[in-house]
Amino acid sequence: MAYKSDIEIAREARKLPILEIGAKLGIAADELLPYGHDKAKVSQGFIDSVQDRADGRLILVTAINPTPAGEGKTTTTVGLGDGLNRIGKNAMICIREASLGPNFGMKGGAAGGGYAQIVPMEEMNLHFTGDFHAITSAHSLLSAMIDNHIYWGNEADIDTRRVVWRRVVDMNDRALRQITCSLGGVSNGFPREAGFDITVASEVMAILCLARDLKDLEKRLGDIIVAYRRDKSPVYCRDIKAEGAMTVLLKDAMQPNLVQTLENNPAFVHGGPFANIAHGCNSVIATKTALKVADYVVTEAGFGADLGAEKFMNIKCRKAGIAPSAVVLVATVRAMKMNGGVAKGDLGAENVAAVNKGCANLGRHIENVKSFGVPVVVAINHFVTDTDAEVQAVRDYCANHGVEAVLSRHWELGSEGSEALARKVVELAESGKANFAPIYPDDMSLFEKIETIAKRIYRADEVLADAKIRNQLKEWEEAGYRNLPVCMAKTQYSFTTDPNRRGAPTGHSVPVREVRLSAGAGFIVVVCGEIMTMPGLPRKPAAETIRLNDAGQIEGLF
C-alpha cells in the first residue's frame, strides 16, 4: 500500500483562518498579530490578561533513546492533542520550532507526521515567523559589540584570550567549530580564536525560552557572561551595553506563535533549543499561557527521557513553577529492535527476541520517569512494519513493569487512532497520583548534581572530571551560582556517552569534557563525551533532494 508523504498530506489540509483558531481559545482578533492567514503571534496584552486564571493539566510526551530517524515524539504529541479534543477535552499542544540545521541534515522537520501534523508544515520547517532569525541576530549583535568594544580601547579590560561568547548560525556547519577571527590587519581588530555553535545551542535561545516577560528577558540578557578579565572576574553583556538593543530585536520573537493541527486544534509553536546540547523544551511563556486557556496542555521534550524529560523536570519545571500531571513515554518496535542489536537495514524484519532484549532500554526510561513522582503510560507509536507478536512483546514487558502500553495509530488515522491513548492519559492525569519533585535540591553542589544525573538517570558508576573542571565548578559556587541546575550535553542515542552503546548499560563512566556557565539562562552546561554544539551535515544531507518543482512547490521536505 502506498502512503502519502507528510508534505502531500499537509498540502491537503483544510485549514481554518487563524483568527478562528484564536477564537477557540478566547483570543480576540485584535490580540492576534497575523502572519498571513494561517499563523499569528499572541499579544503580550492577552498573555497578561489571563494570568489570574487557574492552570489546566500539563502532559509531557517523551521517548526512549531514538533511532537516527526519531521515534515520532512530535507526531505523538500532535496525535494526543487531537485525541484529547476528540473525546471532548479542551486541549492544546505546545512544541518547539524547527531548526534549519536538521531540516537540511538528516533528521527532517519538526511538525509531526502522517495525519498527526501541525500546519503550515512547510513554513514551520523553514523561516516560520522569523523567531530564529531574530535570535541569531540578537546573538550576533552581542558578538559584534564585544569585538567592537575591544577594538575601541577595551574599557572593560577584556582578556582577549578569555572571550567565552561564541558566534552562532542556524545551520549544521562543522567548518565553523573553531575559527580565527579579526585577521587581515590592524583595521580589522585584534586576532583571536573563536568558534560557532548552532543557533539552537545559543544562550539567547535558552533565555528566550525561560524568560517570563520582556523585563525578565532584558535582565537575563544582561546577566550573560561574555568574557573574563585578566584578574578572572567576569565581563557581562550589560558591561558591553548590548542587552537593550538585543531585547528590541527579540521583542516580537518573545510572543508565542499560534497555528493549528490538521484537525484544526490550536497549537503554540515557540522556541527551539535542542535537548542534546541545550535544555530541549519549548518556551515557558507559551506553556504557561496555554495552561491558562486550555484544560489539557500536551508538550514534548527533545530526544529520549534521559535528556529532554530530565531537563524538563529539573530545569523547566523548576524555573517556571509548573508540574506535569502525567507522562507519555513514546516507544517504537523498531527502536526496541535497534536497542536489541538489530542493524538499521534489518529493522523491517520481525524479530521478537530483539524486541524483548531492547525493552531493557524502555524499562530504564520507565524507572527514570517514575523517579520524578509522575505517573507514566507507554505509547507504542505504530509503524506499518510492526507485527502483532512484536507489539504484544512490548505490551507484556510494560505490564510486568507496572505500566500500561497503548498502541496508537495517530500517524495513520489521526485522532481516531489516538483515542485510546487520550482516554488513558485523562485517567492518569485525573487520578491525583502525580507527586512531582526534581531529583536534586537547589542547594546541592554543582558536581553532586552532575553525579546525581549520571548515576540515577544514566546508571553510571562515576563521573570523570579533571581538576580544572572541578575547580571551575567550585569557583562558580563561590561566585553565587551554586543553586543553578545543570544542563547535560551528551549523545541522544545512548544512556552512555558512546552513541553506539545501546540498551540499558550500567557500570560505565561519564567523562566531562567542558563546563559552561549560562548565567543569563540560569544553568550550567556540562559537555560530556564527544558531543558537539555545532553539528555537521551527514554524507548525504537531506538538502540534496530538496527543490522547487515546475509548479513552484517544495519537494523533498518530508
From Swiss-Prot:
Q: What does the record give as the reaction this protein catalyses?
A: (6S)-5,6,7,8-tetrahydrofolate + formate + ATP = (6R)-10-formyltetrahydrofolate + ADP + phosphate
Family matches, as PROSITE patterns = FTHFS_1, FTHFS_2
Primary enzyme class: ligase
State whether keyword ATP-binding applies. Answer: yes
Against Gene3D superfamilies, the record matches this protein to:
Domain 2, N(10)-formyltetrahydrofolate synthetase, Formyltetrahydrofolate synthetase, domain 3, P-loop containing nucleotide triphosphate hydrolases
Q: Name the HAMAP family for this protein.
A: FTHFS (MF_01543)
Protein name, entry field: Formate--tetrahydrofolate ligase
Q: Which organism is it from?
A: Ruegeria pomeroyi (strain ATCC 700808 / DSM 15171 / DSS-3) (Silicibacter pomeroyi)
Lineage of producing organism: Bacteria, Pseudomonadati, Pseudomonadota, Alphaproteobacteria, Rhodobacterales
**Gene responsible for this protein:** fhs1
